[in-house]
Amino acid sequence: MSEITDVYAREILDSRGNPTLEVEVFLESGVMGRAAVPSGASTGEREALELRDGDKSRYLGKGVLKAVDNVNNIIAEQIIGMEATDQIGIDQRMLDLDGTEYKSNLGANAILGVSLAVAKAAAEEVGLPLYQYIGGSNAKELPLPMMNILNGGAHADNNVDIQEFMIMPAGAKSFAEALRMGAEIFHALKGVLKGKGYNTAVGDEGGFAPNLKSNEEALEVIMDAIQKAGYKPGEEVLLALDVASSELFNDGVYTLENEAEPKKTPAQMVDFYENLVNKYPIVSIEDGMAENDWDGWKLLTDRLGKRIQIVGDDLFVTNPRILKEGIQKGIANSILIKLNQIGSLTETLDAIEMAKRAGYTCVISHRSGETEDTTLADLSVAVNAGQIKTGSLCRTDRVAKYNQLLRIEDELDTTALFRGKDVFYNIRK
């Protein structure tokens, strides 16, 4: 009864008002699975292709009607009649149909929408929650959240160079407690910023986006907020950064406009990070070097890889082939997992498996352009990732994922596992 009988895609809007794809997969039993595809602002060069129409008369050229048509008129006829429980077979059928490395014929957004909708339909058909359908009976670990409470870079219209300043409530005993701590710190930060006369408008991912005197001032106001909320920085709450360095890199030099000395060589960037790590309880730095600066990545990993989590996002783009090269060269010790960077559930699971076998941590991540779809939350529990990055404590597109994790924790009840600081198993704490 899990035979696919119909596949239908439509154009919807994401959290930034840009079009994206929503796909519905119908089964013989009458069951339906629905999935929406996210979209990024700062993207890696080697990401799978997000197919846009380019017609400037519609949505400023960002329409996705070509991708919709590819689902409804090309992919659908190839997978109708297949069993929804054959996830690997269906994903492979779509990859073969596309025939390109970066999914540039059908579009990664078209393929991913179908891939996720198939998984959701299959889970519904067999009567399992999505996290358990994907991960099996051992899927029970709730992730420690990386909460992006202050935005800069491509995620905000301000003068802050670093894209994301995040808190990780690692001292919590449960996901629900971690969420509460994060919310309290978020509200405390609003008070701190107001007290300094700063703007409290929010960026794409729900974090505050004020103009500040320096990147370091962002860390100072967050430290103040943690303490005002009644928590101890470095013990109960840790800090994490997403620098998105590819956006700052040109001709072998990094430019941080908000620093006293804006121009930095890769070695000077490592010095800059080491100084911050020595001064603040930073446990994780994502995309500290540009995606093509592999020598810089090696410098950063060698210097700080035993002390903190070094996360590759634009570097690895959730691609097992690129990740394998990074592992062989000893670059980074963690990978950010974004479903739409690679474009299918099967390939995403392959990347996670490869990372874990190499002793790399995995951080399941949203994109800056999100929807109300909560697949991300289920995926983080399905693979026992231990960490999730899904924005601030504001905007429904972000909070939807947190609320789904609360439901999952409730459902798992006494079998739920939350490891807090222990998720950083591959660094010295």
UniProtKB/Swiss-Prot annotation:
Binding note for cofactor: Binds a second Mg(2+) ion via substrate during catalysis.
Which Pfam families does the protein's record reference? Enolase_C, Enolase_N
Q: In which pathway does it act?
A: Carbohydrate degradation; glycolysis; pyruvate from D-glyceraldehyde 3-phosphate: step 4/5
Q: Which InterPro entries match?
A: Enolase, Enolase-like_C_sf, Enolase-like_N, Enolase_C, Enolase_CS, Enolase_N
For molecular function, the Gene Ontology terms on record are: magnesium ion binding; phosphopyruvate hydratase activity
> Which Gene Ontology terms of cellular component type are present?
cell surface; extracellular region; phosphopyruvate hydratase complex
Residues annotated for Mg(2+) binding in this entry: 242, 286, 313
What is this enzyme's EC? 4.2.1.11
What cofactor(s) does the depicted protein rely on? Mg(2+)
Highest taxon in the source lineage: Bacteria
PANTHER family linked:
ENOLASE
User: What is known about what this protein does?
Assistant: Catalyzes the reversible conversion of 2-phosphoglycerate (2-PG) into phosphoenolpyruvate (PEP). It is essential for the degradation of carbohydrates via glycolysis.
Mind telling me what this protein is named? Enolase
Could you tell me which species this protein originates from? Geobacter metallireducens (strain ATCC 53774 / DSM 7210 / GS-15)
Encoding gene (name) = eno
